């Protein structure tokens, strides 16, 4: 958080000194435009699932072990034949450049430094080659089952060429959810943040602002 996106009205505060995610969220909210914060932080409908997810994670705690030798403990694991230094990776999230100009290259680089997997979204705002160049670790790609099967096949082929080794297929969105925060802000992607791995002809409505509507929601319904 030492460097933040300041070109759209934000400031550059000092980042949190520890790993508390609440502090990270507060620092992000202080610098992100309100519509971007709503897109990143919000959920669908009444956000019941969002709250339930957070409550589930809040129940997880670490139980320390005392008076035992923990010098040889390792968090390493293997997933799909790839070695991970820790048993978790970076989940797919769209448009990282909304939060930072480096976007997914920074996220992939962080995963690589940690020695774990980076999963890119089909709607990443950095190219497959850029993300692949940022990490030597395992790379996966999340995809939606697009109506345009030729485009989907092309995306998968280019990701494979860039060294992405697994596909994460999203199957739980037969209906595009209503996101009240996005509707309230008329959320629209800025022109300089694009899904660069998809044909730009598919992305036009995601950049077309309409009062009281989410351009992302409208675009998703069309695809």
Where are these regions (language model features)?
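Residue-level signature of catalytic and energy-coupling elements of molecular machines
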Residues: 33, 90, 111
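Glycine- and other small-residue-rich loops at beta-strand/loop junctions that grip anionic moieties
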Residues: 42, 96, 100, 120-121, ...
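N-terminal active-site wall of soluble small-molecule enzyme domains
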Residues: 76-87, 95-108, 123-136
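Short beta->alpha connector loops
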Residues: 123-125, 145-149
